[in-house]
Amino acid sequence: MQRREFLTLAGAAALGGCRSLCPFGCGASLKEYDDTLRDHCWMWGHDSGFYDGTGKASVYNIPLSDPISMPDACAYMGIPNVCAVTWNPPESDEYLEPFKKMKRVSWVACGGNNTFETLEANCWRLRGKLPNLMGFDLDDYFTYQPKPELFDTGKGVIKVAPSKIGHSKLLDFRRRIDERAAGRIDLRMVIYADYLEDTYAPALAVPDTVLFWTWTGKNLAKLRENFARYRALAPGKDTLLGIYMWDFGGRKPLDMDFMRKQLDVAHELYMKREINGFIFHCTPLVNKKPALEAVEYAREWIEKHADDKRG
């Protein structure tokens, strides 16, 4: 990756255990990816019923289906890495056990209705339980309000896009990661293509990796242009490109022309090393009957390009 060198994880015994469980063959360093496209694929994970349930969960019009775990959904898609999003910290070791079969795991550290302090504490707790945990994800970090935060850098006051925890707490979180897990945990932050003003640049400079998403299907028509705008804010930043398989902004199945376009652009950006990989959204979409066309297209695309290598 571009921002800093990959460092190996400590704890040979723990990693040895990871190797024995991992169907994708965990190596000595979770932050070192192999040269195949598949190894650079992630999947955004939610428990079943989060987006495809009843009541508030039905707002996006996603059809109901039988439950499927995040690791099982990833296995179906042929994806080795998962970003787990659980707003209530899991208490059961039995729940966590299947995640040990993934090559890499990241866990949500911000967003939802739970406090940042609760979610951060859970991330640190999980480090002792998941030897393949290598990322803390700031989901829904920004509040996307028009009035910026005024932050005193000590050399002057700057305008920063408003967030759920504030810029000072973000910097403190960065310091804690550097002190407790330097080179072993990536701090990762979500940003959407709809919000690319200059005030977002100070926050985007803090994480190791940015997760770039296009919420509304029709906006994928301008994916290249929007990604270029993002790059102007965060040049050289390690970036995973989010691949939605449902039109959440439109609350409907994703138009297949847009699905094909976003994967064509994603492949182009990846091969040019403008992005580091992909995040497919999301695990509750995987087991629909009939299957969602965008999901099956993505699955076939991953299989087709799994062994692609960049020059």
Positions of PLM-derived features:
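N-terminal secretory signal peptides
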Residues: 1-2
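Glycan-processing catalytic domains of CAZymes
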Residues: 29-311
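N-terminal export signals
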Residues: 5-25
